């Protein structure tokens, strides 16, 4: 899938906290989904930024987590021990999200699809897909390995 680098310097951001600050810009929608665990290295500052977006409940160890942040505000967020799913339409594009942490199962799963095309990798952690509503395109797909460190995979 071709990505446009229309999010300015967010693509250069390698720290999850700085990345969260950058994706709160107007004109962007960010989709977040946890695979296996995305909480161990989620810090207090990360949680404050998510709270400013309207996400008051963040995942704890191996919980499922989904969020959609549009223009810096949460359109949807959910955390739990069961498999979570959510569907929405942005810019006439269908987005489908799924998160299954490893809290009570050995079968962790994660998916973010746009028009039935998978956008995530099989890596564990916090998956983030960013969509530019002005340019009508995806601008980033990244996984932060918050279960073991604060590294990222593109």
Where are these regions (language model features)?
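Single conserved hydrophobic/aromatic residue that forms the stacking wall/gate
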Residues: 1-11
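Residue-level detector of short, conserved catalytic/binding motifs and their immediate flanks
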Residues: 8-9, 29, 65, 126
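Short HxH-centered metal-ligating active-site micro-motif
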Residues: 12-45, 139-154
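Divalent-metal-activated hydrolytic enzyme cores
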Residues: 48-142, 147-148
């Amino acid at each position: 899938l071709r990505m446009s680098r229309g999010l300015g310097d967010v693509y250069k951001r390698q720290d999850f906290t700085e990345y969260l600050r950058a994706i709160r810009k107007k004109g962007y929608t960010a989709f977040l989904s946890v695979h296996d665990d995305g909480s161990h290295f989620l810090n207090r500052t990360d949680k404050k930024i998510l709270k400013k977006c309207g996400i008051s409940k963040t995942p704890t160890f191996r919980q499922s987590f989904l969020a959609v942040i549009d223009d810096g505000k949460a359109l949807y967020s959910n955390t739990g021990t069961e498999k979570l799913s959510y569907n929405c339409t942005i810019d006439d594009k269908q987005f489908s999200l799924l998160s299954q942490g490893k809290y009570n199962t050995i079968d962790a799963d994660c998916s973010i699809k746009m028009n039935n095309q998978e956008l995530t990798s099989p890596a564990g952690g916090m998956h983030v897909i960013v969509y530019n509503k002005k340019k009508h395109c995806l601008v980033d797909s990244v996984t932060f390995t918050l279960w073991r460190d604060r590294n990222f995979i593109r």
